[in-house]
Amino acid sequence: MNSYQIQNQPYQQIQNTHPSFQQVQPMQVPHLQQQQQHQTMIAQQQHTPPQQHTPPQMNMIQQHTQPMLSQPQISLQMQPPSPILASQQQQQHMQSSPILASSNLTNSNNASQTTLPIITSKLLLKKEPIDQEVVNSTHKTTTTNNKPPKQSKRKEKERLEEEKQTVAQQQQYQPPFIPLASNESNSDNPFKGSHAYGVSTTPYGNSQFNNNNNNNNNNNNNNNNSNNNSNNNNGNNNINNNNNNSNNNNNNNSNNNNNNSNNNNGNNNNNNNNNNNNNNNNHNTNNNNSNSNNNNNNGYQQDKKDDYSMMIWSEVGRKINILIRTTSKATKGTPISTQEIAEAIGASNGVTADLVELIKSINDPTYVRKLPPSSISNTPTMGSQSGGMVYNSSPMLSPSTMSPILQHGNYQMGGDMYFGGNNQFSGDKQSALNNVKNSKGGNTNNSGGGSSSGGTNDTQAKKPARRRKMRYGGTELSCHTCGVTNTPEWRRGPNGAKTLCNACGLAWAKSVKSEKQKELLANSTGVNITEPKKAQKRKKESSDNNNNNNNSSDSNKVLKSDDGSNNTNLTNDDDNGYPSSPNSSNSTSPSSHNINNNNNNNNNNNNNNNNNNNNNNNNNNNNIGNNNNNNINNNNTTNSITTPTTTPFPTTIPAMQIVSQLPVMVPQTQQQPHMSGNIISFQALHQNSGYQHYK
């Protein structure tokens, strides 16, 4: 028996028991049939049923207004079908229109015998059963008029059946929800017994539902993990409250947070293994244990830090006591040794450094002074300091930047002394003397350096530089221009090879080169080309120097060159820094020697100008950070200015000039030897026909 027959049972009982169903007499009225056919034709033209828009209450009105017409209509329509089929049709219509059914049942006792057949006739006009046999043409036309409501009811039936099927499928495939209850059988294995997760007598027909269940469980477990995280964070906050005075505690708290995150990851993995409750509990206990351990560590570090700060304060107090003892002696008038003064200086520096280190340790808990051991700890009065603790850690107080007094106070206190690479002091006196000697390394023994004999540095006297006294054939060589017999190198001149000294040969070669360049330019272009500015400047300076030298040719005058050095018959440097010796017995004439000096001065002026130009170019390229170079350039330019002065002998030569150019001290009573003849400039010689040799 299907659901359709079950729904029709109550109405069939009413139909069988009610007397009106049994008293219906079939009747045939021809004019009513024609009227019905006419209505069906009109309905077919409009494609709508004739009584589609009429409400159910109109049927009740028709029962009272047309009782005589409805009865033959019923007799016509009730002939072909059987009583059971009519009851089924009436039941379907009763389901679709509940107002008619209720009115029919309530008014069944008072209604006439034609009321219920009228309802059945209306039902027959609206719906035709699928299995009904068509008897005549009139019945066929009436059934074709009611196709649209038939389709709507079919759709409604199909929708209801589909809903029933889906509900049945859900009931069939949905597994029963097994709650994660406690272990009732007290079994340690969660995958055995009736409490095992996922074990059911109903076979799983769809794996999608299983995945959904697992996802739900994982979400629940994730919520548990979030609760565990909040608990662990509370524990960390408690640790922070207990250790607000240090930064080490903050670092340890960050470590605790990392541990908590790792534990949460472990909980997620355990969710996949379906061991959620036990694992969460275990991890919570582990987190609590780790937090307690961190609390203990923080307390240990706090105690250690307190000990460290107390140790620094004790050192500060001890050093202050040293200062108080020294100052009290000084106020009383008792004599104070240099050792005590040095200890006081070291103590004051140590107090400053200790306070700086204390501030650093308070602000940064991870700060540790990793410095070499100080020499202060090796002193007799400060030997109680802990090993490895350095109290001279400030860069302002480092041995390389301290003054010699502070260095003496820190390092000359007896015992072994430690020095860096930049220190000028050492433990024993011999090494200190060697350092002092090395610091005065101006008199190095280079290949062409100056020599000294006698003077203040006799202990540091070095053997003189080697001079070439070359003999060309059997005679001794001398410069044809200046008459010098000692020169580093003999050069070619206008008279042939090895006729000029080094300085004169270079000057002559330079002049010849410039003349050749001028000739080449004049011959190539045919136009008088002006010289470059540098060449003009050099020429002007050389002419000025020559004029000044000619004007100051008296025997009681001293020529002062443009580089600031007195042009006496002392040892004068040439271009390469090699001094010439005019006082030697092999010198031919002082006048020619003075000419050589003038030439050397001119060359020096030119070199100074070149250097100044180079420095200016560098300063233009590097505008930032070259202020020192500017100062040096200014000094060079002032030195390169020609200042011809005449000073009578005896004269006092400045010590700095002597030290910078001469390694020996010159006595003040030394007089310049008389010069015979006039001083002839190099330019005048060049204007004449070649170089001449003056005796």
Swiss-Prot record:
Annotated Polar residues bias: 199-209, 422-433
Organism whose genome encodes this protein: Dictyostelium discoideum
SUPFAM superfamilies in the record, alphabetically? Glucocorticoid receptor-like (DNA-binding domain)
UniProt-recorded Gene Ontology molecular function terms: sequence-specific DNA binding; zinc ion binding
Q: Which residues form a coiled coil?
A: 150-174
InterPro entries tied to this protein: GATA_TF (IPR051140), Znf_GATA (IPR000679), Znf_NHR/GATA (IPR013088)
UniProt keywords (A-Z) are: Coiled coil, Metal-binding, Zinc, Zinc-finger
Zn finger region (GATA-type): 479-504
Q: What is this protein called?
A: GATA zinc finger domain-containing protein 16
Against Pfam families, the record matches this protein to:
GATA
Q: Which parts of this chain are annotated as the region Disordered?
A: 82-111, 134-304, 422-472, 523-646
Listed GO biological process terms = regulation of DNA-templated transcription
